[in-house]
């Protein structure tokens, strides 16, 4: 990699050039003047920052905290987020193909060069558990990310996982699965992993790994082989149960083993396969004993004799259950019996925490949203995690309370709690937040940032002073980009600046991200580079496609669509958004047709979000435009 490219990629320019003082915020003078008045007073009310993404809401909150609290601003400022680190391994299924990747790979697939913390996902599945604790695939609806400065490395007996202290891991208690913060676990705690036999439908083509040399990886098609073939392959690779391999291959093989019914452990030298004396048959003893006690207290003594190192085997529990007359059980005892039966038949087992380290970190951390249960497996060996996006009711009731109870540092009169994208809070979470705001009004001030203030409940709006952040004008974005380019020694054409303004749509954060990504190529930035980097088509190309569809040349419109998808690597939702953007500026489309076109675009965007085939839906959208063109032209 060239020296210039290394320098460009070293620090995200969004952070490097983020304003540190209120006076440096771009083109929000009406906001800045009001905030400076609070600094002069040394006090402030609760605030609601409302406006489009990338207009300075987060920056304004950070600048306000710096000027109010000085060197102690970090101690007195809480920004809520929680996720796993970028290099955390995860097994996914994308378009029917099973892949062992990292969250950094998911970032490149779905965020690309776009800014933001959320992206909708329609073609991705991850491993989770069903209500019987059996491992299964489940659809992902969103990929979530944010930046973190500290992470927690959890050393397990089978491998490691890195996550923020606020990320939730799943544990087992007598009521079933329960989410707890990673910061609450300690040496000797038990997390949940799995060993299961998952059969896949093989895709065509591909090769199978037959060796584990330094440059190899387990091929994607290997995960799709029949279970018995995978097991035989693992036996052939293993020497006395150990496969010496690189770190990546070791993790590949560990996951391959786990979905093939073989227990695996990642070690410094490779991966160890466990054929006998499996911890994969063990459950945490404490919740199991409590459940057994509900059946019959005498059975507890029988089961305790099987407990070792805080765990008990599923077989021992099964033997105890065989002596229970289930027909005569009622109420709580019957529920306990059902839970125990579910556990002994489940794929999950207890994995012990051996050590924990807090580490410095500078980068994105991630989460996925899994509709239905919000649980997913990730790690060197799979660990059951819970989506910990911090705008949920649990954080409102716990983390905010804990932070609010501590004394402000540096003689400050209050602390600031910043909730970004607060319009994504559930109504229950907002009601909880309202009560917290009332309870800690003396010690804390809240800043809520939202794209849409209308999504914030009235009781919260009435407790806040509202600041409206306006969409940044093109001139302000261009001026900022020119200064950054000059500071970094990057040459950029005027056409390229226009292109960045177009793709960023008033979002300064995205504009700077696109500039940095384009600069990494190490040459003068022109408009071709910008559109390619941003995975965005030129507006005239989209208008040409719409023109042909509207005027009856469906085949040509279809050809142009496929060119856009191939040349720019655009997603279906990207295409739909650009079509929506361009139809308003096309003189040939009569004004009375616009509402019908907008309605059609909305229909097809919804279908894509729901997971429909992209090409089919995009071609169907062109067909709808074609039909409307015929209707309005009298054809």
UniProtKB/Swiss-Prot annotation:
GO biological process, one term: intein-mediated protein splicing
Source superkingdom: Archaea
Free-text description of this protein's post-translational modifications in UniProt: This protein undergoes a protein self splicing that involves a post-translational excision of the intervening region (intein) followed by peptide ligation.
UniProt keyword annotations, A-Z: ATP-binding, Autocatalytic cleavage, DNA replication, Nucleotide-binding, Protein splicing
Gene3D superfamilies the record matches: 1.10.8.60, 1.20.272.10, Hedgehog/Intein (Hint) domain, P-loop containing nucleotide triphosphate hydrolases
Keyword ATP-binding: yes
Single GO term (MF): DNA binding
Binding of ATP, residues: 51-58
Family in the record: Belongs to the activator 1 small subunits family. RfcS subfamily.
Entry protein name: Replication factor C small subunit
Organism, scientific name: Methanopyrus kandleri (strain AV19 / DSM 6324 / JCM 9639 / NBRC 100938)
